[in-house]
Amino acid sequence: MHPDAQLKAAVKNGFDPNILCQRRLTVVKEPVRTILEKQGTIPADKIVDHVNELRDRAFAVFPYACIGQFSFVELSIAESPYYREMLERVKKGDLLLDLGCAFGQELRQLMFDGAPPTNLYGSDLQQEFLNLGYELFLDQPIFPESQLIAADILDKKSALFVRLQGKLNIVYISLFLHVFDWDKQVTVLENVLDLLAATPGSLIVCRVIACRNQAVLNKTHERMPYYYHDLASWNKLWEEIRTRTSLRLAVDVWEQPDDLVKKHPLPGIYVLGSAIRRH
């Protein structure tokens, strides 16, 4: 079941998506504030209103937590211990995809730090998300539409695979995998491996919602077909993928500090960072 269908099913069962919508911002934090002003040329005194107006309009159509809680202006990619490697590789010509990129906000961070836009790709199921990214950052003249692909990662006949299969060097996946159950996560990650070049050094960097309390995990699985990992299940997932693909994959994991989880209604939630490198 896709995220849209999951949300509709939850609403039908009594879930109120408005609990995901926080109050309007009074301050837009760095680094996105400077990116909006310098790269998107939005006047400094208009930035807060610009972000609030876009959030309200987007949430009315897509009542997702990432929109209601302004996650699209809380950039996190630069906090990854692998960010410097990703940035330098892209500057030297490697191709990077942000999978489930939403408004493409992390790609704008890479661009602001000097990554060539033509080496960056973003993909999301919703074309409207990609369009909203342009409305947020006002940077269409410097970030070609051809770099953003509306596609379903589960569909190997989609434009994403037609254009990029076997060509990518790095795939970044942030707060995306948890909306799938275990089996779908396996399929998503196998498909991601197919998008990557079949060469040593191909890299996946993940930011995953995780949970320390198995009772909370089980309750979440009953409510919606999400799969929130703990460290053991994450390692088990990659053991299964190694077995299924016969690939040599080195998996690094760490706990990544993140303000987002402070707002999460479930106890024991944290962000698990991981990097998976092909050998």
From Swiss-Prot:
Lineage: superkingdom: Eukaryota
EC numbers, comma separated: 2.1.3.-
Keyword tags: Methyltransferase, S-adenosyl-L-methionine, Transferase
Any Gene Ontology biological process: methylation
MF GO annotations: methyltransferase activity
Pathway: Secondary metabolite biosynthesis; terpenoid biosynthesis
Entries under SUPFAM superfamilies matching the protein: S-adenosyl-L-methionine-dependent methyltransferases
InterPro entries, A to Z: Meroterpenoid_MTases (IPR051654), SAM-dependent_MTases_sf (IPR029063)
Enzymatic class: transferase
Residue positions binding S-adenosyl-L-methionine: D124, L125, D152, I153, R244
Physiological role: Methyltransferase; part of the gene cluster that mediates the biosynthesis of calidodehydroaustin, a fungal meroterpenoid. The first step of the pathway is the synthesis of 3,5-dimethylorsellinic acid by the polyketide synthase ausA. 3,5-dimethylorsellinic acid is then prenylated by the polyprenyl transferase ausN. Further epoxidation by the FAD-dependent monooxygenase ausM and cyclization by the probable terpene cyclase ausL lead to the formation of protoaustinoid A.
Protein family: Belongs to the class I-like SAM-binding methyltransferase superfamily.
Stored PANTHER family: METHYLTRANSFERASE AUSD
UniProt miscellaneous comment: In A.calidoustus, the austinoid gene cluster lies on a contiguous DNA region, while clusters from E.nidulans and P.brasilianum are split in their respective genomes. Genetic rearrangements provoked variability among the clusters and E.nidulans produces the least number of austionoid derivatives with the end products austinol and dehydroaustinol, while P.brasilianum can produce until acetoxydehydroaustin, and A.calidoustus produces the highest number of identified derivatives.
Assembly information from the UniProt record: Homodimer.
Protein name: Methyltransferase ausD
